[in-house]
């Protein structure tokens, strides 16, 4: 059965203002551009997708958070995310290196990583998939298309996708 974006709302179960099927999803957004981060957050929230969202601005902080090191060592205050939205062009440690490290670590390799970037360079796409990205999405220029992308991303990764425990 094929659903349009408008039909997704008829299928999804809403709890409060959050889109959920099963347990709420913890999302980590790794984005250094504050305007892009604001758009992602707005897009997710306006589509009732942002269950629990942590925003970090550089690759080193993202690695510390996901690997629970340093100031993020306590899993009760820094739980591992269920989904990572990862930009490629990041300060301190670039997104491809973050992806490579996470997907080569036994404790984090099953966390879905969606590359969400402005780069449509074939080399970046190929390298991301070489490092086992679960999806590669190019940020649209149009605000309307960006909001549609966030809704589709949320519907798939938050509501429909089933991850390994």
What annotation goes with each model-predicted range?
Residues 1-28, 34-54, 60-63, 67, ...:
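Non-catalytic signal-transmission and effector/linker regions of two-component phosphorelay proteins
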Residues 75-79, 103-110, 131:
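Conserved phosphotransfer cores of two-component systems
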Residues 87, 117:
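Active-site residues of response regulator receiver
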Residues 90-93, 102:
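Hydrophobic residue at a beta-alpha junction
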Residues 91, 109, 121:
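The feature encodes the CheY-like receiver
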């Amino acid at each position: 059965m094929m659903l349009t974006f408008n039909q997704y709302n008829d299928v999804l179960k809403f709890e409060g203002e959050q889109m959920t099927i099963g347990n709420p999803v913890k999302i980590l957004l790794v984005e250094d551009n504050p305007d892009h981060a604001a758009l992602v957050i707005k897009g997710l929230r306006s589509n009732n997708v942002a269950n629990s969202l942590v925003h970090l601005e550089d690759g080193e902080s993202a690695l510390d958070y996901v690997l629970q090191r340093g100031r993020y060592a306590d899993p009760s205050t820094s739980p591992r995310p269920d989904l990572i939205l990862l930009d490629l062009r990041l300060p301190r440690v670039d997104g491809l290196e973050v992806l490579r490290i996470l997907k080569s670590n036994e404790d984090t390799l099953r966390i879905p990583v969606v590359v969400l970037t402005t780069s449509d360079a074939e080399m970046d796409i190929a390298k991301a998939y070489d490092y086992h990205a679960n999806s590669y999405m190019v940020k649209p220029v149009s605000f309307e298309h960006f909001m549609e992308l966030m809704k589709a991303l949320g519907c798939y990764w938050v509501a429909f996708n089933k991850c390994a425990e």
